[in-house]
């Protein structure tokens, strides 16, 4: 299918949203998944493909933690040796054994260096795993997009779909990289620290443990109150993005109708709700760290007092107090880190939930066994008692029937909402009929593979869709294996060659993202050249001249005549003057064909077509 591709109006091929721009749904810390446990299990299964790498991360993290946890205990021996030496020196019975202290310090340095090396290794492996997962997810989403039915995209904004590829995958990757590593190291640190604390003093360990239930209660309370505000924040952030997108995309209409103040007022109301929910959610979330720090300081005080009493009794050494206080710090720090990870895990799981929801969406059936080949289609098309509605409860096309011979030019006219474009969508199987049949060369279109079927069609739309690249590349999009000479011949047939050669760089001129360096009429000629190059058997032209001036329309009409020559063509037109030479004109109203015939026959009938035609010329006069 020669598809009309480019981003001049941020709209995609059938008038729907295009793939670029607009409304990103940004992830915020603390957003909660609808089904946390289910989504988290899916995420675990997904990363199961990297279980050996994750296992290596866990082993290296554990080894790093063991060496790190042993450090304070060894350092405490140096402090004890120094204190004992000072006491002996004061008592006159000896002095400080610097050799012993030096060996202890070297051992401590070795422990921390080894810990750092293993920490680096686990971080390096985990980063690789995370990026591979993100790469794989983006690839799967990209492939999924091409298998999605048209109804999915027409029911959602392109910003929402774009967010799955960018924000959600990035949030998942960052959360996975940081939270998994943090959970492993924090858990290993907690276990190691508890063991070392117990070897120093069970009593001091018991005092330090008193802070655990207090911390858990305070943390769960804060999380409980903050969750509802995080959800409101995320919801209204989406509203903000949507309003900004609408304001940007429709700024000309907004200015033309003097609606700037109304738009600002609406935005301010939404922004106010976002501000309030964001302030409360961030404030409550920000309380976690100071609360945990306060509880931790209480633990330090209890440990210091009890340790001092035990040292006076000679139960433990001075270095043991130093080591224990360091362990208390190392004990509370992982708890604080886990508290921070909770919000991160929620965001990560919520992001993965949306990604997996998208990947599990219903797909179009692309291929089936025994499919009919489109290699030698002639372009004969039949609509046989077709009924269709986007909503099952509301029929748009009612018992539609028509026979189209190969090479015929069929014009479809009627008021907005009559079902003209819907007929094209059914023909190309963007949607399937509710009942009836559409035949291509006497085969039901459902007997063809969708991809093969669409190769038989070329399209030129009102909303030109060019992409960032050279003019040569944009025309060649119709047939990627075309030579430069074939591209130029197609441009000549489309009456585009002359204006292309006047541009800086000619065919090699680079178009920007919205193709604003060429006029609307020139864009249309380029898309016609692309369709000519594709050389499809059936052409579809949907309001191709509705957005250009009369002079440009005449040029485009000549190009369209060249394009349609020898091909079955369906022309959806608003300007009836452009379809006077059609073999058959189908006049649609409310999903029904109310009249059909050629231009002269329909005028002679004096019916609905004649009213439309005469009204247009009265307006022109």
Question: Regions from the language model: what does each represent?
Answer:
Residues 26-31, 131, 139-163, 167-169, ...:
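Short intracellular "coupling" helices and adjacent cytoplasmic loop segments at the cytosolic face
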Residues 150-151, 169-176, 180, 188, ...:
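An intracellular "coupling" helix at the cytosolic face of ABC transporter transmembrane type-1 domains
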Residues 85, 196-211, 280-353, 358-359:
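Helix-loop-helix
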Residues 49, 53-66, 77, 178-232, ...:
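Transmembrane helices of ABC transporter permease
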Residues 2-5, 367-368, 374-621:
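ABC-type nucleotide-binding domain
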Residues 36, 54-118, 199-203, 314-318:
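Transmembrane helix-loop-helix hairpins at lipid-water interfaces of multipass membrane proteins
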Residues 48, 106, 118, 122, ...:
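Hydrophobic alpha-helical transmembrane segments of ABC transporter permease domains
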Residues 35-51, 161:
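A short amphipathic helical element positioned immediately N-terminal to and/or at the very start
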């Amino acid at each position: 299918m020669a598809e009309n591709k480019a981003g001049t109006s941020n709209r995609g091929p059938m008038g729907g949203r295009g793939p670029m721009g607009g409304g990103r749904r940004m992830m915020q810390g603390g957003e909660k998944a609808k089904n946390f446990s289910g989504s988290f299990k899916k995420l675990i299964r997904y990363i199961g493909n990297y279980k050996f790498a994750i296992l290596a991360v866990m082993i290296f993290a554990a080894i790093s933690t063991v060496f790190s946890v042993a450090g304070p205990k060894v350092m405490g021996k140096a402090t004890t040796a120094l204190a004992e030496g000072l006491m002996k020196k004061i008592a006159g019975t000896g002095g400080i054994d610097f050799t012993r202290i030096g060996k202890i310090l070297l051992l401590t340095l070795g422990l921390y260096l080894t810990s750092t090396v293993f920490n680096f290794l686990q971080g390096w492996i985990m980063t690789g795993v995370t990026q591979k997962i993100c790469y794989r997810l983006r690839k799967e989403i990209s492939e999924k997009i091409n298998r999605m039915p048209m109804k999915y995209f027409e029911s959602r904004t392109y910003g929402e779909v774009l967010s799955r590829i960018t924000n959600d995958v990035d949030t998942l990757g960052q959360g996975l990289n940081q939270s998994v590593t943090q959970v492993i190291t924090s858990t290993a640190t907690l276990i190691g620290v508890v063991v070392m604390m117990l070897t120093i003093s069970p009593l001091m360990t018991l005092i330090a443990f008193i802070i655990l239930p207090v911390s858990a209660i305070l943390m769960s309370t804060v999380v409980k109150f903050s969750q509802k505000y995080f959800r409101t924040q995320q919801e209204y952030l989406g509203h903000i993005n949507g309003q900004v997108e609408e304001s940007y995309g429709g700024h000309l209409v907004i200015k033309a109708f003097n609606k700037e103040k109304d738009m600002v007022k609406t935005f301010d109301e939404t922004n106010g709700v976002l501000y309030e929910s964001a302030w409360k959610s961030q404030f409550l979330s920000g309380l976690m760290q100071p609360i945990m720090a306060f509880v931790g300081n209480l633990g330090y005080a209890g440990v210091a007092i009890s340790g001092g009493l035990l040292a006076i009794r000679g139960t433990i050494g001075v270095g043991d107090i130093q080591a224990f206080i360091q362990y208390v710090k190392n004990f509370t720090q992982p708890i604080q880190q886990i508290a921070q990870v909770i919000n991160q895990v929620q965001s990560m799981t919520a992001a993965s939930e949306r990604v997996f929801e998208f990947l599990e969406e219903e797909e179009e059936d692309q291929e089936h066994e025994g499919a009919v080949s489109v290699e030698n289609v002639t372009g004969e098309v039949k609509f046989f008692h077709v009924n269709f509605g986007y909503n099952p409860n509301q029929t748009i096309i009612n018992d539609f029937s028509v026979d189209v011979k190969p090479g015929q030019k069929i014009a479809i006219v009627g008021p907005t909402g009559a079902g003209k474009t819907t007929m094209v969508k059914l023909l190309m199987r963007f949607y399937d009929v509710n009942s009836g049949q559409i035949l291509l060369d006497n085969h039901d279109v459902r007997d063809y593979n969708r991809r093969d079927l669409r190769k038989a069609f070329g399209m030129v739309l009102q909303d030109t869709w060019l992409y960032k690249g050279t003019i040569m590349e944009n025309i060649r999009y119709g047939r990627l294996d075309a030579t430069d000479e074939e591209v130029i011949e197609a441009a000549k047939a489309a009456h585009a060659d002359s204006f292309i050669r006047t541009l800086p760089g000619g065919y090699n001129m680079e178009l920007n993202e919205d193709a604003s360096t060429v006029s609307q009429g020139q864009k249309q000629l380029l898309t016609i050249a692309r369709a000519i190059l594709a050389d499809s058997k059936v052409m579809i032209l949907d309001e191709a001249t509705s957005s250009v001036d009369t002079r440009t329309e005449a040029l485009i009409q000549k190009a369209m005549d060249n394009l349609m020559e020898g091909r079955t063509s369906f022309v959806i037109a608003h300007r009836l003057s452009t379809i006077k030479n059609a073999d058959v004109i189908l006049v649609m109203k409310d999903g029904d064909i109310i009249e059909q015939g050629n231009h002269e026959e329909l005028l002679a009938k004096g019916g609905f077509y004649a009213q439309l035609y005469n009204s247009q010329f009265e307006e022109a006069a």
